Curated annotation (Swiss-Prot):
Annotated knockout phenotype: Knockout mutant is hypersensitive to bedaquiline. Deletion of the gene does not affect sensitivity to capreomycin, pretomanid and rifampicin.
Protein name (Swiss-Prot/TrEMBL): HTH-type transcriptional regulator Rv0324
GO molecular function, one term: thiosulfate-cyanide sulfurtransferase activity
A Pfam family: HTH_5
Domain of life: Bacteria
PROSITE patterns: HTH_ARSR_2, RHODANESE_1, RHODANESE_3
GO biological process: regulation of DNA-templated transcription; response to antibiotic
Biological role stated in the UniProt entry: Part of a regulatory network that coordinates tolerance to the antitubercular drug bedaquiline.
Keywords in alphabetical order: Antibiotic resistance, DNA-binding, Transcription, Transcription regulation
Length: 226
């Protein structure tokens, strides 16, 4: 009996490698980024604010846990998430943390702002069908091109304040970014409101949109329309 228990413990130790790889906020930042598409190590370091050594070490930990895969192109190393199941796991970890850890809910409210600023996917779909909103993707251009909500205009968050005038017409703005904890959409709400515009944010993001099986377009930005 003890031998059987030891074998099971050894098996679960292997399973626990996944949990160990996830048990670091910096690694979750990387997964958040890679859920949007493949990136070179240097780009990952820049986007997450890590130095190259730290980013590389965290990528190796994620790879050891089976969560990311790598390929080499010339002298550059590229990483991507290992599969859609990894994206689902990452999204579920956030849901579980939000539901069961009070500190997470408090921190999320501090980062994301009021729930009154957000609309659900169902509400977005209804209002978009009715022509009531202008949907703005505030992620970087390369993430937009890798996959975006159909009909969304791409204005990266760093450009939004200078380009709000391009969003003409009387429709409300809805901003979205990477996922439920992405800070770019809440920042977009503040920027647009400071300019006197009516704006909401999607209460999750591109990650959850994909996982819900909703349509995704790829390619260069669409025109702004009205």
């Amino acid at each position: 009996m003890a031998g059987q228990s030891d074998r099971k413990a050894a098996l679960l130790d292997q399973v626990a490698r996944v949990g160990k790889a996830l048990a670091n906020g910096r690694r979750l930042q990387i997964l958040d980024l890679l859920a949007q598409g493949e990136r070179a190590v240097e780009a990952i370091a820049t986007a997450t604010g890590m130095n190259l050594t730290t980013a590389s070490a965290n990528l190796q930990a994620l790879k050891s846990g089976g969560l990311v895969e790598a390929r080499r192109e010339g002298t550059r190393q590229y990483y991507r998430i290992a599969g859609e199941d990894v994206a689902r796991l990452f999204a579920l970890v956030q849901v579980v943390a939000d539901e069961h850890l009070a500190d997470v809910a408090v921190a999320a409210a501090d980062v994301l702002g009021s729930p009154e600023d957000a609309i659900t996917r169902a509400e977005l779909l209804r209002r978009r069908e009715a022509g009531e909103v202008t949907l703005v993707d505030v992620r970087p251009h390369e993430e937009y091109q890798a996959g975006h909500i159909p009909g969304a205009i791409n204005i990266p968050i760093a450009e939004l304040a200078d380009r709000l005038a391009e969003l003409t017409g009387d429709r409300d703005i809805v901003a979205y970014c990477r996922g439920a904890y992405c800070v770019m959409a809440p920042d977009a709400v503040r920027i647009a409101r400071d300019a006197g515009r009516e704006v909401k944010r999607l209460d999750d993001g591109m990650l959850e949109w994909r996982l819900a099986g909703l349509p995704v377009d790829e390619g260069a930005p669409v025109g702004h329309g009205d």
